[in-house]
């Protein structure tokens, strides 16, 4: 009998030691915020090496495209952010902006995933808020805002990126990470959230793929005055610089960057493709500043 008690006590002690060891191992695991950062690093690197992002980081994306960065957010932003977004959208596209933009296939897939998570796995929304605010609005998007803001700076078109109650973005991010690390989640749930954050990168890479495909297709449009243009391919083109000289409307063997840009910007699908990807691009920039 005595030996049985001793054996039971030994088993209990062993289990306690095992649990203590497991707890200690968990404590040695990086903080949740670090798990998110490290867990998405590979996907982030792959996204960073897409052609669109490479061009962006090289400064080959025109500043005018910044206004499109707000559009995708109007589909997926939290309700409390819509007031600022609405002001930006009205500034860029007019009061009837909702009639002028259209969600692309890849962007819609991303939006559908966010809606699914919100309804079925709400804890996984942490992954999307992390990638949006830690990697985007409070980091890379601030860089984008500085690059595209008018001189002198006004608030027009950048309301969404202005956080009146956040005086120091770096300190706020530290506070946000501390809150992340304080979440009462088991390791399995944390790992699933990291997987969801990785999915966010995958969805954005699908959008980048759409961008690359759209950028490789010549865009043909007809101007209001009837002149046909073939943008980016040296075809018929009419720039504002020679608009007063119709006989010089054809630029043999040369490109018309103005019309090329304007024609692309008028394409609703391309607008949404470009815009939906800007948040992640901003996140990629954030890695250089975190």
From Swiss-Prot:
Region (Disordered): 1-33
Reaction(s) catalysed (UniProt annotation): heme b + 3 reduced [NADPH--hemoprotein reductase] + 3 O2 = biliverdin IXalpha + CO + Fe(2+) + 3 oxidized [NADPH--hemoprotein reductase] + 3 H2O + H(+)
Start and stop residues of the HRM repeats: 238-243, 255-260
CDD domains the record matches: HemeO (cd19165)
Keyword terms, alphabetized: Heme, Iron, Metal-binding, Oxidoreductase, Repeat
Sequence similarity: Belongs to the heme oxygenase family.
Protein name: Putative heme oxygenase 3
Protein species of origin: Rattus norvegicus
Gene name for this UniProt entry: Hmox3
């Amino acid at each position: 009998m005595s030996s049985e008690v001793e054996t039971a006590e030994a088993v209990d002690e062993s289990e306690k030691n095992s649990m203590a060891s497991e707890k200690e191992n968990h404590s040695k695991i990086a903080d949740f915020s670090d798990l998110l950062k490290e867990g998405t690093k590979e996907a982030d690197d792959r996204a960073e090496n897409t052609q669109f992002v490479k061009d962006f980081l090289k400064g080959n994306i025109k500043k005018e495209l910044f206004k499109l960065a707000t559009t995708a957010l109007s589909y997926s932003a939290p309700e409390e952010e819509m007031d600022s977004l609405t002001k930006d959208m009205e500034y860029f596209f007019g009061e009837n902006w909702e009639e002028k933009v259209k969600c692309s296939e890849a962007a819609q897939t991303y939006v559908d995933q966010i809606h699914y998570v919100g309804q079925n796995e709400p804890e996984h929304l942490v992954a999307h808020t992390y990638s949006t605010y830690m990697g985007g609005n409070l980091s890379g998007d601030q860089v984008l805002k500085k690059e595209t803001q008018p001189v002198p700076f006004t608030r027009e078109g950048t309301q969404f990126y202005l956080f009146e109650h956040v005086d120091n973005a770096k300190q706020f991010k530290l506070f946000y990470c501390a809150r992340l690390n304080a979440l009462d989640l088991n390791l399995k749930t944390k790992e699933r959230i990291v997987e969801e954050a990785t999915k966010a990168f995958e969805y954005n890479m699908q959008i980048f793929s759409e961008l690359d495909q759209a950028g490789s297709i010549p865009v043909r449009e007809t101007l209001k005055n009837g002149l046909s243009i073939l943008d980016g391919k040296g075809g018929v083109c009419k720039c504002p610089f020679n608009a007063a000289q119709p006989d010089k409307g054809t630029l043999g063997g040369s490109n018309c960057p103005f019309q090329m840009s304007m024609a692309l910007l008028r394409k609703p699908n391309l607008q949404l493709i470009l815009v939906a990807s800007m948040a992640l691009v901003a996140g990629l920039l954030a890695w250089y500043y975190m």
